[in-house]
Amino acid sequence: MEIKINHELWMDSRVAFQSVAEFHFEWMPNQHAVLEVDGYTDRDILYGKETIYDSKIRIWKEQNNETLFYGYVVNVTEEVAGRLKHIQIKAESASCRLDQNPKSRSFQAVDQTYAETARKAVEDSGGQIICTEGNEMPIKKPVIQYGETVWAFTRRLASHLGTCVVPDITSGEPALWFGMRNGSAIPPFSENEYTIQIARTEHGDGKQTETGYETESRAYYKLGDKVVFGGQRLHIYGVSARFQHGELIFRYLLKSRADYAKLYQEQFTGLGLTGTVVDVRKEEVQVALDIDGGKTTGEYYYDWYPVTGNALYAMPEKGARVEVYFGSRDEQRGFGGECFLNASDYRDFYIFRQLNAVNRSRINLFDQNVYFSGAEKNNLSLSDGYISMGNSRNLEISSRKNIIMGAKKVVVIALDELNICQD
């Protein structure tokens, strides 16, 4: 329902507001923009509170139909006061839709750039993206989205380039900028009154600082817009707006640049991801990870470091099941380290095993039988049902004491002569 807030502002939401007392929103890099609205409606009006959650809300200026905020309601509270209901709405930019469903997948096409990787992640989740950074920088090694939302993953990718992500707040669609928004040049602000901020950067040895300037205006500008202030070329790195007592005032944070700490997915330390070997090259393996549904996502070859060390190891073959390990929180330092068999392979392995010696002697270990064979066709076969011995020449059974043969039937066969002697 549309409501006119004042002579220049309109709001559209599912709440049948009779009046809006105040609202404010904040728009900063690396976080969803947040809007909070305080308003009143008649207590007898039923607006279906349960339908408000996850519904859209938009605020715009009547002149030029310029949108100030367009997002989704994430929280609603109400309080009855006489004949009125006091309703408070909290909403977030539509980028929050990209921050709801954690996923796991890998990006192993290492010749692709950071921008291309971020674009694929966002667009595969139904979002939109504009890349102002990372268009020339290849990822070089695989990056992995592990138990992360698309928003968290792209934010982490951006931090590897020393930049940020910026949510879109005007389209009402899940969209973002990868890198600071490339804004327009705007008229200078008044320098009669402003605040200077000096703060330590988020990373480093604590000695680095960054300086920002806060100033107010009635005009609406956007993140990334450029302005000359105090003789310096600055950019807008923060926008906040407050409507109160019928007046809308914007407050801007101006900086020449911003430093962003490199972010990691901490769960990678000690993690192992299983997959299937697709190809082997010297002491490297190409792996289709299970988190990708067993499909290859690039042609990267992981180094193979067996758990046995450098001695007595063999490279896994195509189709073998292996595990890719991560010794730190940096997923770009993964390596293949263990090859294992599935349940059916284990059974096949134990059903038939064979050891061949250089002199042609052989030991066969079967499921129901153990067989020993010498180079001269001597053999011994042991099973649950019988024992068999054979020799192509002489077969001698000797003992220092007694030899006892006991059975229901004993058969001794000789082609030429049978001698049983006593010394």
Model-derived features with residue positions:
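Surface-exposed cap/loop segments at beta↔alpha junctions
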Residues: 45-132, 142-143
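Juxtamembrane "anchor/assembly" segments of surface/extracellular structural proteins
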Residues: 1-52, 92-96, 177-219, 223, ...
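Right-handed beta-helix
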Residues: 157, 167, 218, 313-423
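Exposed beta-strand/loop interface patches that mediate assembly or binding
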Residues: 230-237, 242, 246-360
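Loop/turn positions that initiate beta-strands
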Residues: 54-56, 224, 319
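Short beta-strand-centered interaction patches in the first periplasmic/extracellular domains
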Residues: 86, 93-95, 133-199, 333-340
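Short, charged/polar, Gly/Pro-enriched secondary-structure boundary elements
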Residues: 45, 95-101, 182-190, 259-261, ...
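Amphipathic, non-transmembrane alpha-helical segments in extracytoplasmic/periplasmic proteins
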Residues: 37-38, 73, 91, 106-129, ...
